[in-house]
A protein has these predicted regions:
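Short beta-strand segments enriched for Tyr within beta-sheet-rich domains
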Residues: 115, 228, 397, 521, ...
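Aromatic, loop-rich ligand-recognition surfaces of beta-strand-rich domains
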Residues: 369-437, 447-498, 503, 511-513, ...
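Extracellular low-complexity, O-glycosylation-prone stalks/linkers
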Residues: 425-426, 514-536, 540
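Short S/T/G- and acidic-enriched coil/turn segments that sit immediately N-terminal to beta-strands
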Residues: 245, 420, 447-450, 540-545
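Predominantly extracellular/luminal regions of secreted and cell-surface proteins
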Residues: 172-184, 337-370
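Beta-strand-rich modules
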Residues: 546-567
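Bacterial Sec-dependent N-terminal signal peptides
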Residues: 1-22
Length: 577
């Protein structure tokens, strides 16, 4: 018994040490997303939802605010996020949005926040200790009445407000008195969309303007090398191509000029898509990052998540965001690390899956098809339901991401008393199983749990066993296993061709001979051979229709193959006029 106790203590210490050494993260970020609080948004099924994120570094911690969460999060490392429940609306605010697309800014030793409103009776709240629910009113009624607001404090201590969300009106800007926190003078028109020039600004899943004019929203401003970068989201939050663009000026209220590289934040491929309506910020080590909205759009247009990517300014002061492998594991920030891709590949794309049961048409293969929009669902949420994936060969497993889906949930709004419990098992032969991860006593809500193993494990089969569901049936949109296979990276893709439509240069058709040993590829393009900042991950295809180009811009393209063993050689850079 003493030996068993000793072994248990050692295993516990190793487990704690492994958790403390977490060095990576994976999008969508794993926070306890609240459920939509709006009844008519959940008619197709109650579901988690948030969007429009802002991350601000304040007193050594990162603070994350987003739409309709009945609170906010703080973190010391950008991985472990701690939720602080808080209602900012007053009883006379007869709206569901708590808060919608909040603005967060720092003045001295104080953090301030306000949500979107067209009314002029919303307070701006302030706190010097936001790790706890310790807030008071800075002003009881902000007279600007701004939707999708954001604030920017300039080097000279002048404060500016930027706002707007419309498919008719522009984004606005105006000065705000630093002391009274009230607007000064009239608002100014700043920028509007030009989708007749910019293909990516066109409305629709396929950028074809087939339903209504596109939306411009989510203003955000950063200053770099004396210039102001006014960022905005377009064309619609429900689309894979939801992205952030940027205009630049020498003055905080313009005039602004469209940056040649746009959109700067874009993620139209992969497991989860979208990278629009966000915020650009610096970490403790002065590295730049961009946080944005990611799209699910199954049970409602506003079913969304949050992603974080490394960003920066190049030698020509071009703002960019690196979304390549943007839902694979990346390194958390340190003094020397800035969101670098780990090189851990997806090991189980479209591999065999077995399950304990299936509910309706939510089939097992949906859990490994690399689409967050589809999911497998068990018949119940009972303890003992399970899903098992076969890697096809013994491989090095470094990390696992468990993406839960919402099926038969019954929650409206935020709950802080729900949690997931599970066990992960591994086997070399599918018969003899060893415990890999034990979260059977977990008491936290982890809808997109990501586990970096302390050491790589050599195995072939991974099984996820349900112990307790936070809400609804046991449903998984992605059981994603990351690591390295045993073979060689894929061979270079041949005959990569880009045909740009001459009658409408916003469009192009990309075609290639697929690599026989690749499951996906990354398409890269940009405005110069050394500025291929835009990337699109495409699974199991040999063509892609691209409708995001700026009409009068020359582009450069390249493509690389991907498999379980690594990344193949990029094709030569191709100029397309």
């Amino acid at each position: 018994m003493k030996n068993l106790g000793y072994i248990s203590c050692i295993l516990l210490l190793l487990s704690i040490a492994g958790k403390a050494q977490q060095k990576t993260y994976c999008n969508p970020i794993n926070i306890d997303y609240g459920f939509t609080p709006i009844p008519n948004f959940s008619e197709a099924g109650r579901h988690r939802a948030t969007a429009d994120p802002v991350i601000t570094l304040f007193k050594g911690d990162y603070y994350l605010f987003s739409t309709n969460q009945w609170g906010y999060w703080w973190s010391s490392d950008m991985y472990n996020w701690h939720f602080v429940p808080r209602k900012f609306l007053k009883p006379y605010h007869k709206v569901y949005d708590e808060l919608c697309a909040p603005a967060v800014f720092v003045l001295g030793d104080t953090l301030l926040v306000i949500g979107s409103t067209y009314e002029k009776n919303f307070p701006i709240w302030m706190s010097t200790n936001p790790r706890t629910d310790n807030w008071k009113e800075a002003v009881d009624s902000f007279r600007a009445g701004a939707w999708d607001p954001s604030f920017f404090l300039d080097d000279d201590n002048r404060l500016y407000l930027y706002h707007g969300s419309s498919n008719t009106y522009p984004l606005y800007g105006q000065e705000v008195d630093r002391h009274t926190l009230q607007p000064v003078g009239a608002r100014q028109d700043l920028i509007k969309l030009h989708d007749e020039q910019h293909g990516w600004e066109r409305f629709g899943e396929y950028n074809d303007n087939n339903f209504m004019p596109p939306f411009m929203e989510g203003a955000w401003v950063n200053k770099h090398n004396g210039r102001y970068y006014l960022q905005y989201g377009a064309p619609g939050t429900e689309f894979s191509g939801y992205a952030d663009g940027v205009y630049i000026s020498d003055h905080p209220l313009g005039p602004f000029t469209y940056q040649p590289h746009n959109p700067f934040s874009y993620k139209a491929g992969g497991f989860i898509r979208g990278a629009g309506h966000g915020a650009t910020y610096q970490d403790k080590y002065h590295h730049w990052w961009h946080v944005s909205t990611m799209v699910i759009n199954v049970k409602n247009n506003f079913e969304r998540r949050i992603g974080i990517w490394p960003a920066g300014f190049d030698k020509d002061d071009i703002l960019y965001c690196n979304t390549a492998f943007g839902d694979y594991p990346h390194y958390l920030p340190t003094e020397k690390e800035h969101g670098r891709f780990t090189g851990w590949m997806l090991l189980n794309y479209q591999h065999p899956v077995t399950v304990s049961s299936t509910y309706g048409a939510y089939y097992a293969n949906n859990a490994v098809d690399e689409s967050i929009k589809t999911y497998w669902c068990a018949a119940t949420a009972n303890t003992g339901e399970w899903i098992q994936t076969d890697l096809g060969a013994i491989s090095n497993v470094n990390a696992i991401q468990i993406n839960y889906a919402d099926q038969d949930a019954d929650i409206l709004g935020k709950r802080t008393d729900i949690y997931h419990q599970y066990r992960l098992w591994q086997s070399a032969d599918g018969r003899n199983w060893k415990l890999l991860v034990d979260k059977s006593r977990n008491k936290t809500d982890v809808p997109h749990d990501y586990i970096e193993l302390p050491q790589p494990v050599r195995t072939r089969f991974i099984k996820l066993e349900n112990i307790h569901m936070a809400n609804g049936k046991f449903a998984i949109s992605g059981l994603r296993i990351f690591g390295k296979g045993n073979g060689a990276p894929p061979t270079e893709i041949k005959s990569f061709t880009v045909l740009r439509q001459q009658s409408d240069k916003r469009n192009a058709w990309l075609k290639w001979y697929p690599s026989n040993d690749a499951y996906a590829c990354n398409i890269y393009y940009g405005i110069a051979p050394d500025k291929l900042y835009t990337s699109i991950m495409v699974y199991n295809a040999s063509e892609y229709y691209l409708k995001t180009l700026d009409k009068n811009t020359t582009y450069y393209f390249s493509i690389e193959p991907i498999n379980e063993n690594g990344v193949g050689k990029r094709s030569p850079v191709m100029k397309v006029e």
